[in-house]
Design a protein with these regions (language model features):
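N-terminal "domain-start" segment that seeds a small globular fold
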Residues: 186-203
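Short solvent-exposed coil/turn linkers within tandem alpha-helical repeat scaffolds
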Residues: 141-145, 173-183
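Short coil/turn linking the two alpha-helices of tandem helical-hairpin repeats
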Residues: 156-159
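Amphipathic alpha-helical repeat scaffolds of TPR domains
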Residues: 143-154
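A non-transmembrane, solvent-exposed segment enriched in polar/low-complexity residues
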Residues: 24-138
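Bacterial N-terminal signal peptides
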Residues: 11-19
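Bacterial N-terminal signal peptides that target proteins for export
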Residues: 2-10
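Alpha-helical repeat scaffolds
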Residues: 135, 163-172, 198-203
């Protein structure tokens, strides 16, 4: 039937892409690795709008590789099976190895290579997990790219106007291209209205 041929073609095409792209281009996000899993599952990377960026079938104890794709360095959702994690990805290879338990994800043990910028961002996240009281501040010597600054704001997700405004001010207008930067622009706008509202209770 028409449907099954279409499906087969897509599966064949995506595995063919997985096999050949690495020789075409050197830049781009590519996720590779080998996971101990009990049954086949899927790896997906989505942007903050939910758009699918990369995906790959995972087979037990077999090496896998997604295609390579040029991306805007930003926060993406990495989904393995039913587990989701927000991670800052850039245009290079990321390696994942370890054990993934789809039934009890908390039993999983995965190790990542190639996410150094994401680990850097973790260092600046507030220890205070309450979004109403937490603040974010960067030391003067912090070496963060504009995309990392907006990614930090997104990951921290605090309600403090001044924290968000300070981070946004570190990103020039022409560098606010990532989805997390657009999110931060909106966030600051909304929080500024709340501040004005709080300062003018008569309105």
């Amino acid at each position: 039937s028409m449907i099954s041929t279409k499906k087969l073609f897509i599966l064949f095409f995506s595995s063919f892409l997985c096999a050949t792209t690495s020789s075409w281009c050197k830049d781009g996000l590519q996720i590779k690795g080998k996971l101990r899993i009990l049954k086949p599952t899927t790896l997906q990377v989505n942007d903050l709008n939910g758009t699918l960026i990369l995906s790959c079938e995972l087979q037990p104890n077999k090496e896998f590789a997604t295609e390579q794709k040029l991306i805007q360095p930003d926060i993406y959702t990495l989904r393995i099976g039913k587990t989701e994690e927000k991670i800052y990805f850039e245009n290079h290879e990321v390696n994942i190895i370890g054990y993934y338990d789809e039934t009890n994800p908390e039993q999983s043990s995965l190790s990542f290579k190639g996410i150094d910028s994401f680990l850097t961002l973790q260092e600046y996240l507030p220890a205070d997990k309450d979004p109403d009281t937490a603040t974010v501040s960067l030391p003067a010597n912090a070496q963060l790219s504009p995309n990392m600054v907006s990614a930090l704001a997104y990951l921290a997700n605090v309600n403090d106007y001044y924290s968000n405004k300070k981070l946004l001010d570190m990103i020039s207008d022409d560098e606010r291209n990532s989805l997390s930067a657009r999110w931060l622009v909106e966030r600051v706008k909304i929080l500024s209205h709340q501040i004005i509202g709080a300062e003018c209770p008569d309105f």
